[in-house]
Amino acid sequence: MKSAKKLLSVLCLGIFILTFTACDMVEKTPEAKAKSTIAKVNGEKIQRKDLDESPSMQQVLSQIKTQYGEEFEKSEQGKEVIKEQKKQILENLITEKVLLQKGKELKVIPKDEELNKEADKKVNEIKAVYNNDEKKFEETLKSTGFTKETLKEYLKDQIVIEKVINEVTKDVKVEDKDAQKYYNENQSMFTEKPNTMNVSHILVKTEDEAKKVKKRLDAKEDFAKVAKEVSQDTGSKDKGGLLGDISYSDSNFDPTFMKAAIALKSGAISNPVHTQFGYHIIKINSKKEYPVKKFDSVKEDIKKQLKQEKQQEAYTKKIEEWKKASKIKTYEKNLL
């Protein structure tokens, strides 16, 4: 099972007209279901087997079996969960189909010899994950529904998709001034050690409630006592609102909350801060802040990060444009 999950994880890194006839009243055979059309992209079919045999779907099924047991997918709830997952994966397959079609249009598909060579290289990279143990590799392929041939075809498609993405993003550039601006605006991200703050908060529903809480705290009432009394954050209420030590770069907290907390000095209490969860009164119990690294020492890392972000933006914009211009039809009734 672990080997199968490992292969699926490696593969998933790559990417990533209802007609009612008498035939619809007849139960389809497994073979017929596998060949049923679940989408058409500019006239090209995506069959159910393309989805069911995809690494993404295999990974979903593996996770469901591990978490809920073998019988879950047969239940009504299980079928609904799987159908929703299939819808998401189908959207990815549609995107891939558009990209493969654009590969032909943009003439970025390598000649067969080169494509085979690149695919073989990727196969060898996957084998290396299994320490080049051929038997273990073949057993894992079998358990994930792949053969050597279908794996290679899948990898060929991923190579073409990668080349299309590279073509779309090839003109993306980041200047030193862009990196300097980002550095100046985010210096807390470039300290010699991660800056941390010990934080407490009180969460209430409305701004009026938050103002009343702030008034009590301004009158020198004990923060922990007030938090235990009125805070609606069940995770920290009984601890007097204590959230503990938080890194300045912690992405588990609301960005507005983090921005307000970072701006406070040690010992300070904020005015009401509005986030998706309600209104917070934030207290900084203590801070540990470290010197900022010199710009030149982090410049290339910043440029690399910004370039990746710009490439993602360019790719997302282009694929949305291509999909909008494509003739796409889905057949959700054939997903299950």
From Swiss-Prot:
PANTHER family: FOLDASE PROTEIN PRSA, PEPTIDYLPROLYL ISOMERASE. A lipid is attached at residue 23 (N-palmitoyl cysteine). GO terms for cellular component: plasma membrane. It catalyses: [protein]-peptidylproline (omega=180) = [protein]-peptidylproline (omega=0). The gene is prsA. It is an enzyme of class 5 (isomerase). Transmembrane segments: none annotated. Residues 194-286 form the PpiC domain. This is Foldase protein PrsA. It is found in: Cell membrane. Its main location: membrane. Keywords: Cell membrane, Isomerase, Lipoprotein, Membrane, Palmitate, Rotamase, Signal. Residues 1-22 form the signal peptide. It holds the Pfam family SurA_N_3. One of its GO terms (molecular function) is peptidyl-prolyl cis-trans isomerase activity. A lipid is attached at residue 23 (S-diacylglycerol cysteine).
